[in-house]
């Protein structure tokens, strides 16, 4: 049993639809525990830094603009194989390709406003968690 942590962001489109609770229910029903959470409105600088890996991609400026268009809910999820499990319940990046019953298939509008972000690997998860949270902000709930 591998207990992992991963970063999840509920994006501005999903926050605006008032479906945070529905998404949290999906995390919990999948065996993931929320061990840290906060709502914030990303500044342009924060969004640029967080998504710097995409800075040379054609969608970068639109992504930064979207992520700063309204508040986001940022959380750390913990559980067995949390990274893969979260990515599975999120669904494909493009909601048109997402399996029915996944967060993106059920709630996302399009590939740009796709409801959620999740870390794609253990190194990325650690880096992304540290971007938003200090270690003392995380409350382990193993048990």
Swiss-Prot record:
Keyword list, A-Z: ATP-binding, Cytoplasm, Kinase, Magnesium, Metal-binding, Nucleotide metabolism, Nucleotide-binding, Phosphoprotein, Transferase
Compartment list: Cytoplasm
Superkingdom of origin organism: Bacteria
EC number: 2.7.4.6
Keyword Phosphoprotein: yes
Swiss-Prot/TrEMBL GO biological process terms: CTP biosynthetic process; GTP biosynthetic process; UTP biosynthetic process
GO cellular component terms listed in the entry, alphabetical order: cytoplasm
Keyword Phosphoprotein assigned: yes
Cofactor: Mg(2+)
UniProt-recorded Gene Ontology molecular function terms: ATP binding; metal ion binding; nucleoside diphosphate kinase activity
Residues the record marks as active site: 117
A Pfam family recorded for this sequence: NDK
Catalytic activity line of the entry: a 2'-deoxyribonucleoside 5'-diphosphate + ATP = a 2'-deoxyribonucleoside 5'-triphosphate + ADP; a ribonucleoside 5'-diphosphate + ATP = a ribonucleoside 5'-triphosphate + ADP
Class of enzymatic activity (EC top level): transferase
UniProt-annotated binding residues for ATP: 11, 59, 87, 93, 104, 114
Family matches, as PROSITE patterns: NDPK_LIKE
Gene3D superfamilies assigned: Nucleoside diphosphate kinase-like domain
Protein family (similarity comment): Belongs to the NDK family.
Subunit architecture: Homotetramer.
NCBIfam families per record: PRK00668.1 (NF001908)
Function of the molecule: Major role in the synthesis of nucleoside triphosphates other than ATP. The ATP gamma phosphate is transferred to the NDP beta phosphate via a ping-pong mechanism, using a phosphorylated active-site intermediate.
Designated name of the protein: Nucleoside diphosphate kinase
Gene: ndk
């Amino acid at each position: 049993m591998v207990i992992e942590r991963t970063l999840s962001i509920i994006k501005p489109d999903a926050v605006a639809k008032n479906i945070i609770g529905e998404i949290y229910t999906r995390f919990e029903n999948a065996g993931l525990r929320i061990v840290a959470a906060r709502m914030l409105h990303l500044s342009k600088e924060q969004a640029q830094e967080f998504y710097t890996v995409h800075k040379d991609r054609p969608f970068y400026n639109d992504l930064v603009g979207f992520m700063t268009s309204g508040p986001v809910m940022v959380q750390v999820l913990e559980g067995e194989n949390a990274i893969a499990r979260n990515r599975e319940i999120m669904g494909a990046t493009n909601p048109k390709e997402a399996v029915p019953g996944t967060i993106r298939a059920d709630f996302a509008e399009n590939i740009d406003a796709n409801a959620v972000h999740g870390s794609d690997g253990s190194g990325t998860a650690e880096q992304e968690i540290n971007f938003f949270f200090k270690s003392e902000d995380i409350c382990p709930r193993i048990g």
